[in-house]
Amino acid sequence: MVERIINSEDISLLISGRQSNPHKFLGIISESSSQDRIILFRPGAHFVAIELQGNIAQATHHHSGIFSLVTPKGTLPHDYRIYHQNGLLAHDPYAFSPLWGEMDSFLFHQGTHYKIYERMGAIPCDVGGILGVLFVVWAPHAQRVSVVGDFNYWNGLVNPLRKVSDSGVWELFIPGLDEGTLYKWELVTASGEVLIKTDPYGKGFDIPPQVTSRVINSDRYTWHDQKWMENRKNTKDQPLAIYEVHVGSWQWDNGRPLGYRELAKRLAQYCKELHYTHVELLPITEHPLNESWGYQVTGYYAPTWRYGSFQDFQFFVDHLHCEGIGVILDWVPGHFPTDSFALASFDGEALYESVDHKDPLHPHWHTYTFDYRCSEVVNFLIGSALFWLDKMHIDGLRVDAVTSMLYLDYGRKAGEWSPNIYGGNENLDAIEFIKHFNSVVHREFPAVLTFAEESTDFPKVTESVDSGGLGFDYKWNLGWMHDTFRYIKVDPIFRSYHHNDLTFSLWYAFNERYLLPLSHDEVVHGKGSLLQKIPGDTWTKFAHMRLLLSYQICQPGKKLVFMGGEFAQWKEWSPDNSLDWHLLDNPYHASLHKCVAKMNALYCELPYFWKGDHKQESFLWVDFKDTKNNVISYYRFSGEDRSSALLCIHHFSSEYFPSYVLHCQGIKTCELLFNSDDISFGGSGKGNRLPILCVDHNIPWGIAIELPPLATLIFQVSF
């Protein structure tokens, strides 16, 4: 009988839900030299039928849900199928050898299993001609792990996983399941507590607030962006004008946000009209809380189901690529939420979270920080990044809150943190993780860009890892953004006393490769919209907006503008409502919109703006000392070419100068390319007079121009 095959302790562990190796005695067991026995565990069942080589037989019920059937010697997994209570007829999950191999374990525990997304989670696959889903999870502290779903009536006793040696990895292949199956993990902790968890490696989830994981076939979509992917370039010497978008609040139809597919069509067309080269999406990784804007992630491998399916998001990226628009994602490897259904205390103990601090919760966000010393956690995060680049064809990752990762004392008071081994406040493990991340991303996907949201003077953020840097392609220049906003808020009458806010960033502008952001963080939480930050009446506000956006275009560095800024939304951003698109019916907003399209087109067309823009040689001051008139002027050069340049002039006062003289030697020709005060942009129409070359004894020493109030003028000059 079956008791001769299964010892009483194993039976007890199985029935009580604490069995870590069910494959040891379930499935096909060799009973003698002449016969095998199929042993099944179906708790609560009184009858189990088995289809064996075309014939249906009834299994013998022994006790406590254990059934068996004697079969011919040499029975194989594909020889029989089990009739399940839910009507499914499928092969036996416990008849298969382990699919997680020694090399998987080695790479995973080294933190270098870079295609971990093809091995962890719920993977639809074919095992010896039998279709099903391989379930794999890392839970080293658990006594038992089961997968539960409709297919087993959410009963954790039915489908316990096998613990693969001492790796802490558990697996089970369940034949007959397919894409769309909803599931969760049921874990028994070391203390005996039963936890229900979503899949850390889940590629799909139910629509929030539901949090059930969903089996996804990540390779089912047929891509059409081969030309884009083949021609995709690293943009260090290319134009990069990014439109930052929150998917749920860009545009609504019938009282709801656009889905991925409709959004793709409208957003691609919109970006083409305004000459944006890329969109950057606030995190669309799955998250339970709308108010987090996606920055408190529970599904690092899944696009949120709020706006459509996994394949719908792939269509979104595909369509934008086919229309010539790149896609960048905000990615959050710095912290994760405390929700009990997700990563927090995943197997009953701190697994993904760091325990280095006295208070494990980050004081700014009340979230957990990741344990960067743990190779498996590092593999989880880097695997997430590579997943989006591989399976979703993403063109860039903007890493959120890098500063909080770099410093142990970020947001913490004395006594709330412990120094590193050298006595400093640098988080050496996080630094190593960042270098590892950038090295792997740039090796596997050389054309992909990485961006750091980093607000301190931490050195070499955009230096290569081989040169001792962190390896990012670009760093957000938050100092430039804050200085600019501080200056623009001041009444023009008093700006002479704040001139340094305009010029200071140029002292360090070439220490890193910078991106100049006008981001979402500055138009929310009571900070007001861009328009609300600016003093003056309506005409003055819009003149300032044209000046602000053209000033950004002319400054060294790549560009980013958050949605709504391009047409000057009055209200500050709300993630719960659409942008106020009706404003484009107003001439002020429509004229600014037209101005932005012209500026972006000019930016993309002229290499003076972007070729070598991270090098000192691309920039030369003409005059940064005119504090009295609130004017700055400078040249922008295209690489090392000095035969021509753009002359950029920004006038931040409300005065009009019919003849403003700039001392700039050697100019032979001077052509006006852009005037933010042009009537077609809503301006006064001043500044369009031909410049007058100032010559002394046949030596050109300057130009005299008509300088409008609150305006940018851009001239193309030759020497």
Swiss-Prot record:
Record GO terms (molecular function): 1,4-alpha-glucan branching enzyme activity; cation binding; hydrolase activity, hydrolyzing O-glycosyl compounds
Top enzyme category: transferase
Keywords, sorted A to Z: Carbohydrate metabolism, Glycogen biosynthesis, Glycogen metabolism, Glycosyltransferase, Transferase
GO cellular component, one term: cytosol
Known catalytic reactions: Transfers a segment of a (1->4)-alpha-D-glucan chain to a primary hydroxy group in a similar glucan chain
Record has Glycosyltransferase as a keyword: yes
Active-site residues from the entry: 400, 453
EC number assigned by the record: 2.4.1.18
Pathway: Glycan biosynthesis; glycogen biosynthesis
Annotated Pfam families: Alpha-amylase (PF00128), Alpha-amylase_C (PF02806), CBM_48 (PF02922), GlgB_N (PF22019)
The keyword Hydrolase is annotated on this UniProt entry: no
Gene Ontology terms: biological process: glycogen biosynthetic process
InterPro entries cross-referenced by the UniProt entry: A-amylase/branching_C, Branching_enzy, GlgB, GlgB_N, GlgB_N_E_set_prok, Glyco_hydro_13_cat_dom, Glyco_hydro_13_N, Glyco_hydro_b
Gene3D superfamilies: Glycosidases, Golgi alpha-mannosidase II, Immunoglobulins
Family listed: Belongs to the glycosyl hydrolase 13 family. GlgB subfamily.
Stored PANTHER family: 1,4-ALPHA-GLUCAN-BRANCHING ENZYME
Subunit structure: Monomer.
NCBIfam families: branching_enzym, PRK05402.1, PRK12313.1
Function: Catalyzes the formation of the alpha-1,6-glucosidic linkages in glycogen by scission of a 1,4-alpha-linked oligosaccharide from growing alpha-1,4-glucan chains and the subsequent attachment of the oligosaccharide to the alpha-1,6 position.
Protein name, entry field: 1,4-alpha-glucan branching enzyme GlgB
Gene coding for it: glgB
